[in-house]
Every structure is written in structure tokens, then in C-alpha cells.
Regions:
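Short amphipathic alpha-helix that is part of the acyltransferase structural core
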Residues: 1-34, 46
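Conserved acetyl-CoA-binding loop-helix of GNAT-fold acetyltransferases
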Residues: 73-86, 157-163
Length: 555
């Protein structure tokens, strides 16, 4: 016999606990659903702990809603959904979206939700004015044609698509092109390059050809691409594409007055090819023509952002830069700079330094703090690469340092790296230009060791550290050995500040000796000893990151 309603409890089931996760997966599976990524899962339980109804929340999206067949007469949907809405509000989301099966439409309408888009097996709803407000914003622009792009990153292929689209819709009035073609960037933060970087690359790369508007949660996002409610992933993909296209035809295109949607052809990716085919099938009923532009190709095939990402991942900037317009270069260099900082941080067994395995000699720093610091200074790197004067570069460095201190609660985590990488970004890795820039911007806030290295154009890096790093790059302990090589030759003011000049010279000698007779056991022993003693070669860590960056940039 079913439990009385008053004895049924709604509570969180922590999915990090395997027992609860398996219970939720089994419950959803018995209701024809599958568990998707959620931040919170709430369930109504009977007296024996069995799930009668459940639902998840990911940011502002309600998903994975199900009620067991035996409990469908108990009216559990409304209190469960109300709890999820309250949980979203507590997290700062006043506007909540939901994906559900069409048969659940009335339940959600009774709670103030309205339909945004439909597909045969799903509907997308929300309870606020999010889409209405975004469409109101779009009505401030007028377009004949629309391109929606991720640009992860913006390549010559993207530029070609924009050029061809502008040519199609502008006819003999090239001066009116930007007013007739609108580009909507994908806003979802699931790409190698963050939204703000992709937005800037699109704006710079399409200047004079199109108007770039702000992206939203309503096109190609977690909000329009649900995959939680069907087991068959190919069916789920079909459903999410239909929802996305329906929302564009119902709302986005009319708000802009657009009658054309431009896409690039897709010779290799079946999912994107199917998306293009569905657009051609669905959008004409909304008065929107789909224009497919053949992809730009070179001798190796169609130019794609995935090629660029693969080259960057392997540290091959030259190959990546051959596939992008000059306007994307600062953000690609930024990616390599951030990658270098992350590689240095992620390396374990670094004597006295913070890593994934230890805080080293630091009481005020840990791995999470260093990650926050990297995130805080990242937005300044593209501007450093583009800075037109030494004064502008210097001010950007000051601003980046302030952002770092705000993110870390006043802890100096990356001051030296900001200075060195800023010079390298602006000079594109050219030693003489780095030295010239350093001579113009070095001030009293720059430590003597960092100043001397910069004024030399980082001679030791080019003459010694970079060749050494390349020689051990495939070694299991290549990063640690390169760090020891740097430590053995660098007058590290961080070490001097912590343990004095005499001990600092001894640390240099110890690093050289450890490198000569290297073993993992000796390295581990040194890590423990330096942590206890307070030795932290922070300057060497900055130079290791710079070495990694330069190797990628000059590869």
C-alpha cells in the first residue's frame, strides 16, 4: 500500500555517493530516462527510501523529471518542481527553464511556465522573461541574414563564411553589409576558448562585414540541447536539434526580421550535417531560407577549428596560426600562455612549489588558489599582446596584478609570470623586442632578478633553458628536470627573500647536483626538505612557465 502523502519526504540525493547515484539511474531508467549532468537532484521518498518522484537542476535548468507509475496519483510533481524552482532561486536564478515530455506541459503551465519550443518528443519551457528580454534586445538590430557560430577559435574558414554570406545578401551595396548580416556567438562556456574571447575574435574577424550581437542561452546551449530524457543518443540529438531550430524559427529570426540563415557545409561531422539538413527541412515553414556555403579548404581538406585546437594542444603555434586571421592571433597566444601556466602548476614533485600533490613551502597558497589566479589574469593577456605602447603594456600589467590580488585575497601568486608573459606576448617571443620593451617599462616594482633577465632579452632562456626543455620534453620528469636546470642557474629573488643569499646559492648548487644524479627518490626527498625549510623557487616557476610558452610559440 502506498505511503500517505504527509509521510513522503522530498530530499537531496547526493550523486557523488555511488549508492545514491545508482539508485537515481535505476529510477530514471525504469521511467525511460537517463541521468544527465546536474548540480542537484531532489527526490520524493517513501518510508522505505524508495524514489517515488525525482528531478534535477543544472544551473537554471530543471531536468531528469520523473514520477514512478505507482505514485502518479499522489500529486508529487507540483511540490517537487516547486522545490526545484526554490533551489534555483537560492542559487540566484530567477528565470528557470525546463525540458520535459509533451504530456507534462499542463503541470508546468500550472506553475507559471510557458512553451518556448517544441519537438515531437520534448518541449522547452521557462517561467520568466528571459527569451522575451533577449528578443527585445535583438529587435534593436535588423538583419536579412544570420550566422550562429561557436568560433572555437575563429579561423580563416569562419572568415570565409562571413565574407560569402555578406556577399550574398548585400548585392551591390557593400557599405550596408554590416547592417544586413548578424552573427550570434554561442555563449555556452564549454569550449576551449571562453565566450568573451570568442566574442572578441568574431568581432575583430568580421569587422566591416557583419554586426556581432551578444549570445544567449537560447541557441546551441545547455538550454536548447537537452539529452537527458532519451536513452538513444542519436534520438536525443535529433530531438535537441529540432528544439533549437524551432526556437530560432519561432523567436530569434522574427526578432531580427531575418529571412536567411547561413551555414557552412559539413563534409566530415555527421551530427552537424544532420543539423544542416534539419534546418533546411524546418526553417522554410517560418519564412527562413537556409543557405549552405561550401567550406573553405586547403590541400589537407576543409579548414576547421578542430585542426587549430589540435595544433595548439600539441604546442604547434605555427601550424595553428596558418589557419587563422591575424585578428585571432592574440587569443591563440593567450591560450598558449594559460596552457603554460597550467602545465607548470599541474606538474607534481616541484621542490618548494605548489602543485596538485603539495602546497610546497607555502602556508598561504594551494592548488585551487593558483587556478583562481590564472583565471583572474587570463583576460588581460590578449590585450597585452595587442598593446600599442610600452605605457599601455605596463598599465595592463598593473591591472592584471590587481585582479590577481583580488582573486587571491592579497597573495602574490603570479606577479613574475604576468611581467614575463606580458613581454613575451607583446613581442611575439622575439628576444630583442622583449629586451627593448623591458628597458622602457621596468620600474621599481619589478624585482632586480626579473628586471635583469628581461633586460637581457631572457638570454638564459633562449641559450640554455629552451634547448634543454626540448631535449627532455618526452621524459616522464621533463618538467621537473627543466625546473632544476632553471634553478641551478637563476638568481631567484624569491629564494633569497625567504632564506637569505647564502642559502639561495646553496639551493642553486643542490638543484644542479640533483639534476646530475637525478632520481625520483632524491627529488621527493628534496621536495619534503624544501617544504619544511621554507625554500620556494617562485622565480624559477615563472621561468618554467615562460619556457613552456616560448617552446609552443616558436615550435
Amino acid at each position: 500500500m502506498m505511503e500517505p502523502f504527509e509521510r513522503i519526504d522530498i530530499q537531496e540525493l547526493p550523486l557523488s555517493v555511488p549508492t545514491f547515484r545508482h539508485q537515481v539511474e535505476d529510477f530514471l531508467g525504469s521511467n525511460g530516462l537517463r541521468l544527465e549532468e546536474v548540480d542537484l537532484y531532489l527526490a520524493a521518498l517513501d518510508g522505505d527510501g524508495a524514489i517515488l518522484a525525482g528531478g534535477g537542476l543544472q544551473r537554471d535548468i530543471i531536468k531528469c523529471i520523473a514520477v514512478s507509475e505507482s505514485a502518479r496519483s499522489l500529486g508529487l510533481s507540483v511540490p517537487l518542481i516547486s522545490r526545484l524552482i526554490s533551489a534555483a532561486a537560492e542559487r540566484g536564478y530567477a528565470n528557470v527553464k525546463v525540458f520535459t515530455k509533451p504530456e507534462n506541459r499542463r503541470v508546468f503551465e500550472s506553475l507559471g511556465f510557458h512553451v518556448l519550443a517544441t519537438a515531437p518528443q520534448a518541449i522547452l519551457m521557462e517561467n520568466g522573461r528571459g527569451l522575451e528580454d533577449y528578443c527585445s534586445y535583438l529587435r534593436g538590430f535588423h538583419a536579412v541574414g544570420v550566422i550562429i557560430m561557436n568560433a572555437n577559435p575563429f579561423t580563416l574558414g569562419h572568415r570565409y563564411l562571413v565574407e560569402q554570406a555578406a556577399s550574398v545578401i548585400s548585392g551591390d551595396s557593400p557599405r550596408r553589409r554590416p547592417r544586413k548580416l548578424i552573427i550570434i556567438p554561442v555563449k555556452e562556456e564549454r569550449s576551449r576558448f571562453p565566450y568573451i574571447a570568442r566574442l572578441e575574435m568574431i568581432r575583430q574577424g568580421s569587422k566591416g562585414l557583419a554586426t556581432v550581437v551578444e549570445g544567449s542561452d537560447y541557441q546551441i546551449s545547455a538550454a536548447t540541447f537537452p539529452t537527458y530524457f532519451l536513452k538513444d543518443l542519436s534520438d536525443a540529438a535529433e530531438t535537441q536539434m529540432r528544439l533549437d531550430i524551432d526556437l530560432f524559427g519561432r523567436h530569434i529570426a522574427p526578432a531580427l526580421g531575418a529571412t536567411k540563415r547561413f551555414v557552412g557545409s559539413e563534409p566530415t561531422d555527421p551530427l552537424t550535417a544532420r543539423y544542416n539538413a534539419l534546418m533546411k527541412e524546418m526553417l522554410p515553414s517560418y519564412g527562413v531560407e537556409v543557405v549552405e556555403i561550401p567550406r573553405l579548404s586547403d590541400a589537407d581538406g576543409a579548414i576547421s577549428a578542430s585542426w587549430v585546437r589540435a595544433s595548439l594542444a600539441s604546442g604547434d603555434f605555427a601550424s595553428a596560426s596558418a589557419l587563422i586571421p591575424e585578428s585571432s592571433r592574440p587569443n591563440l597566444m593567450t591560450y598558449l600562455a594559460v596552457r603554460a601556466l597550467q602545465k607548470e602548476l599541474e606538474a607534481p614533485m616541484k621542490p618548494g612549489l605548489v602543485g596538485p600533490d603539495s602546497n610546497g613551502a607555502h602556508q598561504d597558497m594551494d592548488y585551487a588558489l593558483m587556478l583562481r589566479s590564472i583565471d583572474a589574469i587570463r583576460p588581460f593577456f590578449p590585450h597585452m599582446a595587442m598593446a600599442g605602447t610600452p605605457e599601455e603594456l605596463r598599465q595592463l600589467g598593473i591591472d592584471a596584478e590587481q585582479a590577481m590580488l583580488e582573486a587571491t585575497g592579497g597573495v602574490n601568486t603570479h606577479r613574475g609570470a604576468i611581467f614575463a608573459l606580458g613581454l613575451a606576448l607583446n613581442a611575439s617571443g622575439d628576444s630583442e623586442r622583449m629586451a627593448a620593451l623591458a628597458a622602457q617599462i621596468c620600474g621599481e616594482t619589478i624585482t632586480p632578478g626579473a628586471r635583469q633577465m628581461a633586460l637581457s632579452g631572457y638570454k638564459d632562456l633562449f641559450d640554455t633553458w629552451l634547448p634543454f626543455y626540448r631535449s627532455v620534453k618526452d621524459d616522464t620528469y621533463g618538467l621537473q628536470k627543466t625546473l632544476l636546470k632553471i634553478m641551478s642557474g637563476l638568481d631567484d629573488t624569491c629564494v633569497v627573500h625567504r632564506v637569505g643569499p647564502v642559502r639561495a646559492q646553496e639551493v642553486k648548487a643542490e638543484a644542479g647536483a640533483l639534476l646530475e644524479t637525478f632520481s625520483a627518490e632524491s627529488l621527493k626527498e628534496t621536495c619534503g626538505r624544501y617544504a619544511a625549510e621554507g625554500v620556494s623557487p617562485g622565480g624559477a616557476a615563472d621561468m618554467l612557465a615562460l619556457t613552456i610558452f616560448m617552446e609552443s610559440l616558436l615550435h
